[in-house]
């Protein structure tokens, strides 16, 4: 599990301060709704039927105990005492007050959590098997590769305003697809070639939206070093 360094902590604090200023300007009428919309979406904030909804990032479904306790306290202090775990392994608060969201993000930053790029047309949280790292049938632990994708895609300027949201999943089991990779925009199945080298079988174009589709294989073996290329 990735641990913040000083650069990460500083960037998280600056991001919270920036959004606090944007929220205050929006509440004061200095930012129009169409101006505030892309700013709040980049920080995980939706407004549904006049009620804000905040989606909090849980990278590849992993949380420490202190993070879970902080989430529990936030739901008690700022919401209705409960939260919603999503199919992309994130957490949603459905009743926060708009003016409280910067404070929520500040509290999340204290335990190395955020809501960046959990909403809007960007690369969403990369998901994997909920039992990754402990399954006996894994080819290798998929979580480091999910983290590589997360670091590469977060704040990448080319991925901030995509035509639609984009979803990636990684599966490491040879027997069972526990990450549902064939219904993702990119699905990566970890495999080994005849020489024993680690790589990925690549599925693309899957989805469960308006026109459901099983993603076909476009490459049987992609070397792990070429994952981002």
Can you say where each PLM-predicted feature lies in the sequence?
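Iron-sulfur (Fe-S) cluster-binding modules
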Residues: 1-54, 66-70, 74, 78, ...
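Small-residue-enriched alpha-helical segments and adjacent helix-cap loops
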Residues: 24-31, 51-197
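Non-cysteine beta-strand/loop elements that form the S-adenosyl-L-methionine
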Residues: 118, 203-205
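Short connector loops/turns at beta-strand edges and beta->alpha or beta->beta junctions
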Residues: 205-211
């Amino acid at each position: 599990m990735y641990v913040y360094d000083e650069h990460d902590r500083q960037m998280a604090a600056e991001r919270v301060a920036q959004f606090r200023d944007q929220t205050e300007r929006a509440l004061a009428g200095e930012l129009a709704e169409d101006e505030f919309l892309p700013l709040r979406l980049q920080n995980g904030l939706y407004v549904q039927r006049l009620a804000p909804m905040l989606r909090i990032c849980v990278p590849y479904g992993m949380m420490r105990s202190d993070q879970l306790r902080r989430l529990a306290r936030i739901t008690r202090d700022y919401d209705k005492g409960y939260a919603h775990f999503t199919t992309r392994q994130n957490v949603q608060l459905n009743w926060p007050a708009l003016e409280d969201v910067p404070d929520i993000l500040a509290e999340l930053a204290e335990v190395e959590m955020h809501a960046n790029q959990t909403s809007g047309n960007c690369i969403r949280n990369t998901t994997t098997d909920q039992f990754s790292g402990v399954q006996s049938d894994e080819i290798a632990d998929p979580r480091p590769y999910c983290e590589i994708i997360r670091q590469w895609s977060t704040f990448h300027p080319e991925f901030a305003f995509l035509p639609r949201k984009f979803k990636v999943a990684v599966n490491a089991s040879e027997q069972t697809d526990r990450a549902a990779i064939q219904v993702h925009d990119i699905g990566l199945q970890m495999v080994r070639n005849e020489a024993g080298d680690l790589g990925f079988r690549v599925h693309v174009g899957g989805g469960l939206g308006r026109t459901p589709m099983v993603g076909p294989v476009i490459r049987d073996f992609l070397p792990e070093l070429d994952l981002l290329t």
